[in-house]
Amino acid sequence: LKTAVLLFILLLPCAAPAAESFLEPPRWSLEVKGGMFKPALENWSQNFGDSGMREFAAAFGYKFLQQVELGAGAGLMKSKGQVFNQFHGAPAGDVTYELYPVNIFVMLRGVAVDGQWVVPYVGGGWTRMYYREIFQDGETARGFADGYHVRGGLQISLDGLDQAAANRMFIDYHVYHTFFIIEVESRRVIERSTSINLGGKAYHAGLLFEF
């Protein structure tokens, strides 16, 4: 009996990974990321003295298959500078420029086997870009425009770096897998009344959790 109990205790740490293989594959994902957005606006770098805007974003997704995901996300960006009013053409002095993109997307993932270390992906979909410009004289211009985005990148598994931490994430938070992500995203969003493109190109890095 003592021998049987000892064997049970020794085999217990293997129970969680073994049990996971019999569970349904994870369907939901949470993505948090940040990076640099380079607007397509003319004379952006000259007017704002910077090559881009810092962006922070998050997204939820649902996998119908491990290779096909539907999701939605949102982000925020802000930059300060001294520019002409992009929508009226008059000198504006100091200005704060804000963008808030909202995305609905489909993602195709290159998953061939369970536990794959590197997963390439491409995606795209609809984008609504909310904008706001706050000028020195107190005037505010705001609105939104619709367009589209495309993106591609890599999801790099972090599970193998610390298996004990991965097991704790599964037991405590029901997180099956954690990935480090790097991606490039291109947006084209035309404001109809002015024909200004509120889109541009973004470079992101962050974390993806599957549960």
What are these regions (language model features)?
Residues 18-63, 190-194, 200, 206-210:
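Short glycine/proline- and aromatic-enriched beta-strand/turn motifs that initiate or cap beta-hairpins
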Residues 19-28, 62-67, 111-119, 159-178:
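Short loop/turn motifs that connect adjacent beta-strands in outer-membrane beta-barrel proteins
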Residues 26, 50-56, 96-102, 118, ...:
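Residues that define the transmembrane beta-barrel architecture of outer-membrane proteins
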Residues 28-32, 66-72, 100-104, 118-124, ...:
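Transmembrane beta-strands of outer-membrane beta-barrel proteins
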Residues 32-34, 58-62, 72, 104-110, ...:
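Residues on the lipid-exposed face of transmembrane beta-strands in outer-membrane beta-barrel proteins
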Residues 34-40, 74-80, 110, 126-132, ...:
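Transmembrane beta-strands of outer-membrane beta-barrel pores
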Residues 59-136:
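Gram-negative (and chloroplast) outer-membrane scaffold detector with strong preference
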Residues 155-211:
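Predominantly the C-terminal beta-signal and adjacent terminal strand-loop region
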